[in-house]
UniProtKB/Swiss-Prot annotation:
Organism of this sequence: Saccharomyces cerevisiae (strain ATCC 204508 / S288c) (Baker's yeast)
Topology relative to the membrane: Multi-pass membrane protein
Cross-link (Glycyl lysine isopeptide (Lys-Gly) (interchain with G-Cter in ubiquitin)): K128
Protein's recorded name: Protein SNA4
Domain of life: Eukaryota
Protein localization: Vacuole membrane
Encoding gene, per UniProt annotation: SNA4
């Protein structure tokens, strides 16, 4: 019968068995001889067997290879300033309202226009003058 455990790897299981009999040896195998965790475990084992064993179990669980997936960070590349607002060498198609593609067509705008009113009560832009005037210039 095959035993498949999702809570720990084989190396973790062996370290748990070693930690049950001699806790500093398990921490030594996982962290190395001059690490602060090993020295802490030796001190805890000298103070009492149970604190050393609990620390060894905790350290084996925390440093398990299965926990590495919890700390994966995904970064999304944003705008590159050198590529932003650079005029392209391609001729631009001037689309009049009659030549614009319809909503359901496959040709879509690369950069859709987003209308965000900055002031409450501002009318949407319908090629009309805005009712809100700009603030006066700053004069020192």
């Amino acid at each position: 019968m095959c035993c498949y455990c999702v809570c720990c790897t084989v190396s973790d299981f062996i370290l748990y068995i070693v930690a049950f009999f001699f806790p500093p040896a398990a921490v030594l195998l996982r962290s190395g001889p001059c690490s602060s965790d090993f020295l802490l475990n030796v001190l805890l084992t000298l103070l009492g067997f149970l604190p050393g064993m609990l620390h060894a179990f905790y350290y084996i669980t925390i440093t398990s290879p299965l926990r590495n997936a919890e700390y994966v960070y995904y970064y999304q590349q944003g705008w590159v300033d050198s590529e932003r607002n650079v005029p392209s060498n391609r001729p631009q198609n001037s689309q009049t309202p009659q030549n614009r593609p319809q909503q359901g067509s496959s040709a879509r705008n690369v950069y859709p226009s987003v209308e965000t009113p900055l002031l409450q009560g501002a009318a949407p832009h319908d090629n009309k003058q805005s009712l809100v005037e700009s603030p006066p210039p700053y004069v020192p």
